[in-house]
Amino acid sequence: MITIIGNKIIIDSSRATLDDKASFEQAVNSILEGGATEIIVDLSKTVYLPSELLGYLMGKKRALMGKGMDIKISAISEPLKRVFDEARISGFLGL
């Protein structure tokens, strides 16, 4: 489940799904259409992201950075942070 508050997207599920990926994409597009240049993502409740959602997040971050925009992770659960560290993507994601 995804919650949007302003330019912040909260993934409310401990285990995100492919349905959450579709909702996340819609949320990102909605926030960008509203004129935001920065999107904040809260992963504090999430311990698992499907690879498709992670790939989308990384690809979208790269694309937005090329336009002077960004997606930033404001909070992350310890288990998910460990996965990002092991995959060596924490630096790219600004963690």
Can you say where each PLM-predicted feature lies in the sequence?
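Hydrophobic residues in beta-strands and at strand termini
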Residues: 11-13, 43
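Conserved catalytic-core motifs of GNAT/GCN5-like acyltransferases
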Residues: 95
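Short beta-strand/loop segment at the start of cytosolic alpha/beta domains
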Residues: 1-11, 23
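Amphipathic alpha-helical interaction surfaces in cytosolic regulatory modules
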Residues: 18-92
